[in-house]
Every structure is written in structure tokens, then in C-alpha cells.
A protein has these predicted regions:
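Conserved SAM-binding loop
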Residues: 1-107, 215-220
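S-adenosyl-L-methionine-dependent methyltransferase catalytic module, highlighting the catalytic core
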Residues: 79-84, 94-216
Length: 221
């Protein structure tokens, strides 16, 4: 199992516990070190590499499962990204993608802000860029945080965008599940996962507002 943008390695742990060979890739060296230490504390084996995945040619055609969790919304050229990932799938391999819909209350990842006001303010990321940037500076956010939030605003991902990109890059959707309450909220906030109402899930654009996480399983056509 390969995870691109593995962070601290939490998503790979269940697979390691099942006996799978796991490899985590992240461009942040600090995250890779955290992942290594995390697996050591859990007494599990895993390989973690600080690199751009597309520089690791020796991993091509190797993985039956690739995880892309909370990463696609940070990628500017999503078409090139998904197309290039085909090189790393083994025959009949699949890719799991999860992301917060852009128009949901915290789809801009503003919870990373230092200011308690900004980090708890829903929908602020939907403001025009210049106004959003101005408010972030008024609340004395660090310039690095401001730039990260503005980059996410530029590279945002919606349900409609993901579906279109999947089709354009030669994949098909095997399974789609939209969540009103993100399954990860159970660990973070003690909230039980809750799927989005089917009627709302079929309303374009409106469904983005209520989808705190969107799960997709895709494979090449």
C-alpha cells in the first residue's frame, strides 16, 4: 500500500497491522520523521520516504492500492497528478481519494490558522481573495500560513471537479461516498460518521456545502 502525502502515517497503520507492506511518501521531512517514530511506537514496520513521488521511478507498477487522503485539494494540476499516478499502479490496482469539498464550512483548511477567530470561522475561505487575505492579516496570521491558505483557495477541489478530472484522465469511479460527518471526526471530536443524505448528494454544488469529506475509489478504464 502506497500513501502519497502520508503525513504522520496514521492512515497506513491499519494496513501495517494487517500485515501489508506499507510505503509513505511526503515532501515534508518533518512529517516523515514523525511517521517513522509513530510506527516505532506502534511496533509496526513501514517505509517512509521524504520525496516527490514522481521522482521515485523504481516504485512504478508496484502498488495494488494507492491512498490520496486530504492531498488532491492541495494539487494545482490535478489532471497531470492523477494521470502520472497510473505509472505506480499494479495491474487491476485502485486509488482511494478523500478530500473536503471546497464549499463546506471549513473546506479552506482555515482551522490551521493561529487565530481562534479565523480557525473557528466557517465559510470565510469563500470570500474574494483580496478580502480573505486582508482579514487574515488583520488577525496577524503568519505570512507562511496566509500563503498556504491562499494556495488552497487556488487549488481547491469540488465534487464536480473531481468527477470531471477522473473522467478526463482515463479513470472510472468504482465507488463514491459523501459524508455529512467525516469519519475522521470520530477520533478528533468523538462524532459518529454520518453519510450525506442521498437526496442532497444528487444536487450539484449544494452537496459541496454539506460534504465534510468525499471518498472515492477509482481505477483506470
Amino acid at each position: 500500500v502506497l500513501e502519497v502525502g502520508c503525513g504522520e502515517g496514521g492512515n497506513l497503520l491499519p494496513f501495517a497491522e494487517l500485515g501489508c507492506d506499507t510505503i509513505g511518501i511526503d515532501i515534508a521531512v518533518s512529517r516523515i520523521e514523525q511517521a517513522k517514530n509513530f510506527f516505532i511506537t506502534k511496533k509496526q514496520k513501514g517505509t517512509f520516504i521524504a520525496s516527490d513521488i514522481f521522482l521515485l521511478n523504481d516504485l512504478q507498477k508496484h502498488f495494488p492500492l494507492i491512498l490520496i487522503h486530504d492531498v488532491i485539494e492541495h494539487i494545482d494540476n490535478k489532471e497531470l497528478f492523477l494521470h502520472s499516478l497510473k505509472n505506480y499502479l499494479s495491474p487491476n490496482g485502485v486509488i482511494f481519494i478523500a478530500f473536503p469539498a471546497w464549499q463546506m464550512p471549513f473546506g479552506g483548511h482555515q482551522q490551521i490558522a493561529r487565530s481562534k477567530v479565523i480557525s473557528h470561522m466557517p465559510f470565510i475561505h469563500l470570500l474574494p481573495r483580496i478580502l480573505y487575505q486582508g482579514i487574515l492579516r488583520i488577525f496577524s496570521e503568519q505570512e507562511s500560513t496566509i500563503q498556504e491558505l491562499l494556495t488552497i483557495k487556488q487549488t481547491r477541489c469540488t465534487i464536480e471537479m473531481l468527477r470531471k478530472t477522473v473522467k478526463q484522465t482515463g479513470y472510472q469511479i468504482i465507488n463514491e461516498q459523501l459524508y455529512f460527518i467525516n469519519p475522521h471526526y470520530k477520533i478528533k471530536f468523538g462524532l459518529a460518521p454520518r453519510k450525506l443524505n442521498r437526496m442532497i448528494a444528487h444536487i450539484p454544488f449544494i452537496r459541496n456545502v454539506f460534504s465534510t469529506s468525499c471518498f472515492y475509489l477509482i481505477k483506470p478504464t
